[in-house]
């Protein structure tokens, strides 16, 4: 009886110890979790604090930059800003003009910079002979405009300027050079005809200011006979030195012999394809001697 009681007491004692140990382990686990929770919270709080600090720093830098920009433009009026941008545009145009003059220096177009822009010189030539030169004084403003020039009044300068000066200065100069160079070439031919072949003309050479309409009477002496021809040359294209329309007729109402008609047609073709002075030179080379009886 006593042994049974002892065993029961021992069992209860061991069971109580084990239960107590389990309770202690549970309490320790709960205590550890409670200790870890504040540590995690502290870490999160530190991270949040660091992010806020970085945010405030970035905001401060942005405000400083905005303040510097505002300070730099505080004393600049809108008109001044516009003037600055226009000045930059004009400077770029000036640089472009330098490049254009450099590219055209071998074509007869040259120039120099002035206090207000650039003065362009357009030199003309024909068959290797240097002829007249003209100038155009351009003012580099917005819009670009011509201050002075020596272009003849019968050259359509205003029309050319209206088309190209504001949009394509390079093309404006090229087109103007074409007109001036062709005019000088036509004038050179007419002058040569009058100076070198005046003795072979019947009456004066008639021409207009542009030298794009010429009419004259000349003689050749085929087969010992003298017969005058009347020539009319029209240059519809003012940028060319050869006529677009040529008419050669006989003077009088008499019908031409067949040989003279052939010569008349051949002369028309020559006037279409050669400068005036070269046409008369070719007559001599082919044995078509001009009527020397007209020389006085």
From Swiss-Prot:
For this UniProt entry, what's an example GO CC term?
Mis6-Sim4 complex
What is the top-level taxon of the source organism?
A: Eukaryota
Keywords of the record, alphabetical order, are:
Centromere, Chromosome, Coiled coil, Kinetochore, Nucleus
The biological process GO terms on file are:
centromere complex assembly
Primary subcellular site in the record, as a coarse category: nucleus
Q: Which residues form a coiled coil?
A: 17-105
Q: Where in the cell is it found?
A: Nucleus; Chromosome, Centromere; Chromosome, Centromere, Kinetochore
Q: Which InterPro entries match?
A: CENP-O (IPR018464)
The annotated subunit structure for this chain is: Component of the CENPA-CAD complex, composed of CENPI, CENPK, CENPL, CENPO, CENPP, CENPQ, CENPR and CENPS. The CENPA-CAD complex interacts with the CENPA-NAC complex, at least composed of CENPA, CENPC, CENPH, CENPM, CENPN, CENPT and CENPU.
Q: Which family does it belong to?
A: Belongs to the CENP-O/MCM21 family.
| Role according to the record | Component of the CENPA-CAD (nucleosome distal) complex, a complex recruited to centromeres which is involved in assembly of kinetochore proteins, mitotic progression and chromosome segregation. May be involved in incorporation of newly synthesized CENPA into centromeres via its interaction with the CENPA-NAC complex. Modulates the kinetochore-bound levels of NDC80 complex.
Spell out the protein name for this chain. Centromere protein O
Q: Which organism is it from?
A: Bos taurus
Taxonomic placement: Eukaryota, Metazoa, Chordata, Craniata, Vertebrata
């Amino acid at each position: 009886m006593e042994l049974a009681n002892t065993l029961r007491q021992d069992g209860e004692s061991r069971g109580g110890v084990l239960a107590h140990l389990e309770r202690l382990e549970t309490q320790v686990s709960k205590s550890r979790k409670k200790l870890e929770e504040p540590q995690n919270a502290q870490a999160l709080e530190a991270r949040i604090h660091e992010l806020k600090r970085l945010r405030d720093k970035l905001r401060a830098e942005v405000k400083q930059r905005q303040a510097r920009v505002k300070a730099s433009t505080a004393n600049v009026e809108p008109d001044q800003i516009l003037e600055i941008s226009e000045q930059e545009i004009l400077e770029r145009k000036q640089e472009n003009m330098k490049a254009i003059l450099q590219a055209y220096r071998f074509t007869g177009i040259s120039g120099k910079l002035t206090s207000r822009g650039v003065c362009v010189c357009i030199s003309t030539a024909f068959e290797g002979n240097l002829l007249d030169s003209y100038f155009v004084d351009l003012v580099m403003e917005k819009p670009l405009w011509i201050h002075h020039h020596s272009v003849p009044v019968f050259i359509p300068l205003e029309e050319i300027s209206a088309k190209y000066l504001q949009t394509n200065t390079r093309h404006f100069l090229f087109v103007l050079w074409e007109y001036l160079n062709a005019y000088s070439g036509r004038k050179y031919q007419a002058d040569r005809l009058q100076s070198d072949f005046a003795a072979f003309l019947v009456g004066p050479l008639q021409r207009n200011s542009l030298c794009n309409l010429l009419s004259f009477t000349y003689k050749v002496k085929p087969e010992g006979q003298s017969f005058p021809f009347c020539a009319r040359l029209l240059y519809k294209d003012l940028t060319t030195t050869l006529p677009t329309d040529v008419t050669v007729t006989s003077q009088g109402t008499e019908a031409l012999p067949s040989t003279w008609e052939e010569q008349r047609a051949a002369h028309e073709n020559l006037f279409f394809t050669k400068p005036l002075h070269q046409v008369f030179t070719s007559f001599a080379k082919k044995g078509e001697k001009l009527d020397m009886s007209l020389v006085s």
